[in-house]
Amino acid sequence: QSTIGQMRVPFTIDAHRSPHQQYFANRSFIAKQVGNVRDVGAAVGYNVNVGFPIILEAGLFNGSGLTNQKDYWTKGTNYSAKAQFLLPCGLNVVGSIQKVKPSDVTVTMYDGGLTFHHKQLLIEAEYLYKHYSKDAFEGVHAFDGFINYDFLMKKGPLQKISALARYDFMSNHSNGKRYENSNGESVLKVNDYKRSRITSGITLSFAKPFISDVRINFEKYFYAKNSI
């Protein structure tokens, strides 16, 4: 399997989900701030079965995202690789790595996660670490964990009602681009401040002919003192 063109880079669990596959109305910090990457490039995938399925994906990318397609191919190789191990017990083990270079600073991201699915129950936990070369910025830590349970409806317009709860966290985050500070120095700045969040809610999943999901969520944010 191969793909060329605009795509969601094969990296992380939650950031790799399309909008209709998201469980919450608002994406996790990993999917929205720290690990969200769409880009232009080429990727290949390979499936193998060793008693259980293994899905391997890797690609080379422009590194500039979707809106600034110039000169990035000549700045170095930007790559991403991902492996999924679909164990027979209902556990999906995922590991991925990505390297980009948005400026003279190389950013390398490492991600690992577990998804457990049994009947109507789904539990997921994911951790991402983001490293900046040249000690340009302190490494970023991000975590996302949630639980989802589906209550199946036998009659009426609803196919199921899902109850969900999530906790996610991120430390101070930089996009890897340099900005001029008050002293005229070119430095990386904090684009997204350290925060944590709890989310709870329900999802109403309608059956035919109106196949759609209605997500109703409550969010509570926690910021460090004087961070914003």
Identify the role of each PLM range:
Residues 1-63, 75-77, 84-92, 146-148, ...:
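Outer membrane beta-barrel
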Residues 3-6, 15-17, 93-228:
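Outer-membrane beta-barrel pore domains
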Residues 41, 80, 109-111:
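Conserved positions at the start
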Residues 63-66, 130:
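A broad detector of the eukaryotic-type serine/threonine protein kinase catalytic domain
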Residues 69-73:
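Active-site cleft segment of glycoside hydrolase catalytic domains centered on the general acid/base Glu
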